[in-house]
Amino acid sequence: MSLRNTAKADIVLKNFWKDNAHFADLFNAVLFNGEQKLHPEDLKEADVDLSSVLKFNGHLETIQRLRDVVKKTAYGMDFVIWGIENQQKIHYAMPLRHMIEDALSYLKEYNEIAKKNVDEKAANTKDEFLSRFKKTDRLHPVITLCVYYGEKEWDGATSLKEMLELPDYLENLVPDYKMNLL
């Protein structure tokens, strides 16, 4: 009797990239041309849940997103969030998906800072009170890498502007969002 392989590639890859040495090697090779900027011993597990409640004019909207693998590096008080998205099929809206997931990471951190500022009554000005964010507050960088392991060559967009019908006269007015693709 032979055993069937029922392993799911996405789960195998998530487990592989959770190893700090593999994770650091990947980012160093792909984003830093082999220079060791990330060190395995500096990487810490981070929350993969980006779910959020958005409030606009009294209307609530919930968004649920989970990242595949997320690590955090901390250098004193400063840190960076590093994310991996494994992708087996070409996703023609991947730049938009990355932008949304990165924005949700920033929103999550903003909400944590805003709550702390409100709890501590930390606003020094009306502007800080309004935004619940002090002039000196800063968010931390979020860097995401899409690891595409499909059989076909990636033929999708790698930036938001590649997804847009954009007249030349608007080119400089529309911000772009580029994704890191391997």
At which residue positions do the language-model features occur?
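Accessory alpha/beta interaction modules
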Residues: M1-L182
